Amino acid sequence: MINIQNIQSNNWGSTRISIIGAGKSGIAAAQLGKHLGSEIFISDNNVSPDIQKKIESFRNETGGHSNKVLEAHLIVISPGVPDSIPIIQECREQNIPIVSEIEFASWFTTSPILALTGSNGKTTTVHLLHEMCVSDGKTSLLGGNVGIP
């Protein structure tokens, strides 16, 4: 099992990562994992032909989530994946660490991060904060569900 308390010294080349959700941010997480040398497996219920083409260079499954997901040391979930689906429950039962793709990416940057959560108004607030930073002469990049995954 991966020790998420000691992320920086982890040997990513020997780490198996399952990514649940093959949307824009899931694919970005897969590319980061591949760049780190990790073994990547992508699982999604339903993908478009365009997404299928983007994930063909990774081990993947579509049309459901099999027990292959459970072969991972780390599970990275995309924002649209509900915590309540059976495969997530099985990952928890097996004590496989589960993180969002944003958290996974945050482990590999030294830049300051402004993060927003909540039910309503996140996109508007993120755009407002971005514009405030830019007007103050700061470099600002939008990430997550808006901007760069």
Feature annotation, model-predicted:
Residues D44, E61-G63, V99-E103:
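Beta-strand->loop->alpha-helix junctions that form or flank phosphate-binding loops
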Residues K53-E56, E90-R92:
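Short, conserved catalytic or adaptor-binding loops enriched in Gly and charged residues
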Residues Q5, Q52, E103-S106:
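Generic detector of well-ordered alpha-helical segments enriched in charged/polar residues
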Residues S48-K54, D83-P86:
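Short, glycine/polar-rich helix-capping loops at beta-to-alpha or helix-loop-helix junctions
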Residues G63, I77-S78:
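Glycine-rich, N-terminal phosphate-binding loop and its surrounding beta-alpha-beta segment
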Residues T15-R16, K34-H35, N67-L70, P79-P149:
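Phosphate-binding loop of NTP-binding sites
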Residues M1-P49, E56-R59, L70-E71, I75, ...:
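ATP-dependent carboxylate-amine ligase
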Residues G21, T62, G118:
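Pocket-edge structural micro-motifs
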